[in-house]
Amino acid sequence: MTTKHDVKTFQGFILTLQEYWAQQGCAIVQPLDMEVGAGTFHPMTFLRSLGPEPMSSAYVQPCRRPTDGRYGENPNRLQHYYQFQVVLKPSPSNIQELYLGSLEALGVDMNIHDVRFVEDNWESPTLGAWGLGWEVWLNGMEVSQFTYFQQVGGLECSPVTGEITYGLERLAMYIQEVDSVYDLVWTDGPMGKIMYGDVFHQNEVEQSTYNFEHANVEVLFKQFDDCEKACNELLALETPLPLPAYEQVMKASHAFNLLDARHAISVTERQRYILRVRTMAKSVAESYYQAREALGFPMCK
């Protein structure tokens, strides 16, 4: 695929991935407007992996992992970063070739570079999800993850969904040949050059300070409990509302991650909180499946 975008900028790099996967037939959807720790939390992955309905999509997802913050001092460790998620259901037999095609679209020459698929099965304890998978290593550095979902929210995936997750900053650093994420060129156009650091460095400094020092522990514990209560109430309605209930799951998960960053949860408590999130996610998954089933799985028609 020839692209009109400059892959040597972070902006052009993302546009190229979107264009490539659009040409493969994916719906290019927009990022979820909530704090999540990974692109898998997006309903287009978590919920759409359930049931028999086919659905292929691709999207950028901003991810927040409060414990990974380093006050803007680490060149490749961030508490806020981007993933590019591709979800293919049912998973095509040539998914590996499609992925390699995306690297070629980004200007990675397979004749020069060493691309390896290293077995690494994936699990998300909070989402009750797991799958068979591989890490993708480019010249010895992990840049992507492949997963064939076997189970989501405790439910078997049939057909199997194929998921590809790109670590955007890491892959872009490789393509731009820089050692610090803050040195990535975001865009270079008529209005001048803008760097990743111009866009996000101050955010990393301030959010790290908030995550580790100022997030209100008492408020976060209450928020977690409130989200759990709201989730259960929404699923207990005469006509359950699994989509709003799922938003409560994500809010509870983020509250837990902030509590983790504040070291407010002991090791034993930590497992208990993970189990509470997983119980919510499982209930949502079952309710969503039943709702689609009641509609006759319309996308199968």
Curated annotation (Swiss-Prot):
One of its GO terms (cellular component) is cytosol. Its EC number is 6.1.1.14. InterPro entries: aa-tRNA-synth_II/BPL/LPL, Gly-tRNA-synth_heterodimer, Gly-tRNA_ligase_asu. CDD domains: GlyRS_alpha_core. It comes from the Bacteria. GO terms for biological process: glycyl-tRNA aminoacylation. PANTHER family: GLYCINE--TRNA LIGASE, CHLOROPLASTIC_MITOCHONDRIAL 2 (PTHR30075:SF2), GLYCYL-TRNA SYNTHETASE (PTHR30075). This is Glycine--tRNA ligase alpha subunit. It comes from Shewanella loihica (strain ATCC BAA-1088 / PV-4). The gene is glyQ.
